[in-house]
Amino acid sequence: MKKKLGNILIFVLIIGLTIGYGIYKDSQSKVTVNKIYTMEYQEQALSDLENEKGNGNYTLQNIFMKYNPFSTNTQSMYVYFNTYKAAKITYTVSCADYADFTATAYQAKEFQKEHEFQLIGLIPDCTNTITITATYKDGTSQSISTNYTMGSLLGDEDIQLKQVSGSKQDLGNGLYTLLGNDADDQDFVYMYDTNGILRSEIPIIGYRSHRMLKQNQTLYMSVSTHRMAAINHLGRIEHIYNLGNYIVHHDYQFNQDGNLIFLATNEEKNSVEDCIIKLDVETEEVSELLDLEDLFKSYKESTDHKEGSKWDWMHINTLQYLKDDSVILSSRETSSIIKINDVSTNPSIDYIIGNEDFWKDTDYTEYLYTKVGDFLTSGGQHTVTYMEDNSLESGQYYLYMFDNNFGYSKTRKDYDWTVNEGIQTSITEGTTSYYYQYLVDENEGTYTLVDSFEVPFSAYVSSAQNLGGAHCRRFRNCRTIIHL
């Protein structure tokens, strides 16, 4: 099933990074990134901020502002003031040669008298004009402007991206987030606005931030292979979690109790990327919910493994946690989608969506769902996303994904991927990947391809994200973000 690209945004971001050890170039904040992600540093930063702010009478005409006090966003400013009557706050950042950036400041109520927020969007090595506007319930407003000259970025990433192709469609007011470059040098999370201008540079310890999740106005994100940070709306780190002997890999979600469920590698094992763990965000306790070897023991034993190397026999790369305590996993190594029931209490295999030929002669053929229609089952897929739809029957739902359309299994050298006509088997010669959307019917045990379109080839990683709700692809009223 091939369809024209239509209402799709494809970002191919190639950012050359030549970054130093990880010391802020701005003289106001010369601290190592490792130190930032300690509670000692954050508590001292909060104390310094409160002491500097003191008990001053801060109004719209006398705003207290401090550049990046918690060192978590090099393009940010802490802002505090009061208005004589309840107001909502917006701000605009202007700098010569760059489009303006306007945002609404966070506050607990739409209109209130006390205003404390993190302003983002400053342009480095530039005198920024910051305009803050208070709008009152009666529709009247007041504005003030001030200038701030920001120093350099910590990294050497592009401030302004070049648009190589695309339509003139309005993209709305949002930020596109790159969750980490996984480089040998300093790693970052970048946020670009719809004009392709960098508005947030967030240093992390290393690896990448796989997701940004929000709970109770707190942002949770991984900042290294073993650590998670909980960051409030001011940019202050409120909590740092250590995952012990587990490495976070690719994905995490909140469960129904507000705790975090991770895909992980247990460093005490000889295999990788095959565990699911839970982090209790209150007690900090880390527990293992599932080792996939327990459910796929005979399959693992049938795979190839070079002594002394890590055994990447399953390589799970996506986690979707459902309200009934089941999880949907994407396995790159088997090019399969796997649903596990009761992951927190008594895990069991529900179904597998994958090539029947790949799973034949194993103990797991009974779990395979039946393909309905003539299409190529996904290969090496990523970001498999669960999507409900009120128009569907109970037991039916959609799964959409970035289908890499790449057939390769390092631990299954006995399997010839070329038997699947159309699948790419060469990293350098591959031509086409896809956006795929399946209709899954648990009542019938089937899956059907209901939507797809071609995208540039990417053998590994990459992602697809629909913006616009459950119906968006079906009714063509949303944007799909493809990140290669």
Where do the model's predicted regions map?
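Membrane-proximal envelope biogenesis segments
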Residues: 14-18, 24-25, 47, 129
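Solvent-exposed serine/threonine-rich low-complexity stretches and specific carbohydrate-binding patches
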Residues: 99-110
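Membrane-interface motif at the C-terminal end of an N-terminal transmembrane signal
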Residues: 18-36
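N-terminal Sec-pathway targeting helices
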Residues: 1-13
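Histidine-/acidic-rich catalytic cores in large beta-rich domains
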Residues: 32-47, 51-55, 61-93, 114-116, ...
